[in-house]
Amino acid sequence: MDGKKLSNPFSTGNGGAAFENKIQTLFVTLMLSGGYAPCLPQGPIVRIKLQGAVDGYKTDDLIVFVEKPNENKPYKLLGQIKSSIKITKNNQVFAEVIQAAWSDFNNSDVFTKERDVIALITGPISKTDTDGVDGLLEHARHTCNCEEFITKVSRARFCSENVRNKLTAFKEQLKVVNNGKYVEKEELHKFLRHFHILGYDLAKKEGVALSLLKSRISQFNNNNPHPIWCQIEHEVRSFNQNAGTITLETLPKELVEYFKKSETSRISPDFAKENVEGDSEVGLATDWNHHPTAQKLAVANLIGSWNENNEADIKVVTQIVGDDYTNWIADLRETLQIHDRPLSYKNG
């Protein structure tokens, strides 16, 4: 009996392209909502180039441009998107990523060393790859020269065999693209300092990354954020097909307007205190940016809202914050006593 061979539904269903679209949509959502790009200095995302091969990029799935005040030249993240990958010396997908990255790294027309970064953006990868590659790249970024880097990685008690195996994988892949010659240690160290791996679970229908993104969208409007996410996806798909460049000016006006916060009147500090009904006083506005709980408040604001009586909600929050929920929430409860608190507690 003849029959077709079963294949991976993710591949036959064009899952790779769908994942790429979601990753690109993630960065556009960050741009629209005033978020920051990973691995770059904090500053507004001003444009995102999709399919940048036409402009000379080899790492071309998306190029994110970030600007900082009083600086004329933008910072760039060159991103290659792969739904899955293995970081080994023989993996063909990893070979393609390294070939493109090495070409861009040595092309001053598209990449500025000590300023721009290259990122392999992928779905969840194996624990071996995660631990090994993260350890390797962090050692590269926390050593001042190649000698210190090689010494630390080589010491058995200081570094794991897994990290050394990943170093071998990078060295062997770079040898192939360097005309069969091993890259000099100094250049290898520099390359690894500029290389990042970013993992997102956006291949899942309702993963943590998508939950955070929708929570961020909902900060601008209490309506259901899903239609807005879908609209951004649709626009990104169109730009991607045309190797376009996305800015706030090239997106539909109504989409950009959705992310504009309403104007709020500000009170001069001289009038920030006034008597209310005799002796009571309204206190000065709290500087939440420098408050001891600022980091926790930022995460809570990103999450949006959750139900403490719902175990599933608590589980998701715990996963996001990476800490015991009871410990994490304790400081936030204290902020509820402050007059201009940024949190509210219903039915409590």
Predicted regions and their residues:
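General structural concept
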Residues: 62-63
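A short acidic/basic microdomain associated with nuclease active sites
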Residues: 31-58, 67
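Hydrophobic alpha-helical segments that either span membranes
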Residues: 23-26
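Cytosolic nucleotide-binding catalytic cores of signal-transduction proteins
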Residues: 20
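Acidic metal-coordinating catalytic centers involved in nucleic-acid phosphodiester chemistry
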Residues: 1-17, 29-33, 69-348
